[in-house]
Structures are given as C-alpha cells and as structure tokens.
Amino acid sequence: MKLRLFPLLLLVLAFSSCGSKKEKDDTTTDTTICESSDYNSSKDLIDLYHQADSLVKIGEIDTEMMQLFVDNATAYAEIHPDDTLTPHFLLYAGIFEMDIALSTPSESKRNARFFQAVDIFNDLTKKYPNYKNLPYCYYYKGQIYENMKRTSDAEGEYRELVHRFPDTDLGRNIADYLKVRGFEKSSDDIMHEISQK
C-alpha cells in the first residue's frame, strides 16, 4: 500500500511544482515583500502598506504585516529623511502601531504599543513641522490617550491641534468635540454642576 502511494505523491508534487513562469515570479515577489526586512525602495514600502491596509479595510487585520510596515517605515525614515514620502510613511506607521495596540489583549502590552505610536507621531511632528497632514498626528495622539483613559493628555493634544490648526476642518471639528466632551470646563466647574443636581 505504501509503495503505491509514494509514486502518486511524487506525481502530485511534480504537478504542483509546475506552473507558468509568471505564477512563480508573482509568488516570489509576494514572499519577498512579506519576508524582507530591508526596504530600500519606497515602491516596496508602498506595496507593503497597500497590502496591509487592504486587509484592514475588509476587517482582516494582519498585525505581523502591519508590524513589518511599521519597522520598515521607521527604518526608511532614518535612512531617507529627505524623501518626500517619509512623512507619509511615518504617519501610516503611527496609525498601524495604534491599530496593533487596539488588537493587543494585554493592557500593559497595549499601552506600550500606544506609547510607541505616540513616539512615532512625536518624531513626525518634530522632524516635519510643515507636513500637510500634521494635524492628524495630534488627533491620533488624542485618540490614543482617550483609549488609555488619560483624558488630560488627550485634551492637551486636542487643544494643541485646535491652537495650531484652527482654520482646518479637523481643527474646527475637534474644537466642537472639546465643547461636547466637557473639556472646556475645569474639574471644579464640573464638580459644581454635579453638586447643583
């Protein structure tokens, strides 16, 4: 019985290894993108981002692929600080790090990842102060701090966003959000309102 299965197994392996050259090249490319940790090309990094982001958009979060992007985007930023795509890569690295944190069950590990995302956003705001999407760094830091239940830190980030970018749609929306959330009131004002009820 075993002797009859062995040739059949060999035949199946032979057919499965056969394929067009294009199929083999596509497989090699995908493997290279997923396994490589050396992204010298912005195109490779963009491709990796699109792969990870397309999964996020359909609700399939691949934290390993996202982490690969984060690691390579931050490394790329160190090697190519003057590349016009570098701030974009850092913004998306921060967002992915935040998404990874949100899917991390352990609170201490989740908070560590949140702080890594904040560090990426801080690095971006420091090195690229004229980046057009800079307001989103403050917004995402505020979101992170709210998720961590650090409301005073969240309020600080939101206020910085409103102060620095008051004429943007995001700045106006966050100003309204601050009013709705009650951030406009001091803790004494809130306590006074509670005691009046």
PLM region descriptions:
Residues 15-17:
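C-terminal motif of bacterial Sec signal peptides marking the signal peptidase cleavage site
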Residues 19-22:
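Bacterial signal peptide processing site
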Residues 43-44, 65, 85, 92, ...:
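Structural signature of alpha-solenoid helical repeat junctions
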Residues 54-65, 99-114, 149-150:
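Short coil/turn connectors between adjacent alpha-helices in alpha-solenoid helical repeat scaffolds
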Residues 76-86, 124-134, 162-175, 184:
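Short solvent-exposed coil/turn linkers within tandem alpha-helical repeat scaffolds
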Residues 96-105, 143, 147-153, 180-197:
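Alpha-helical linker/edge segments of TPR/alpha-solenoid repeat scaffolds
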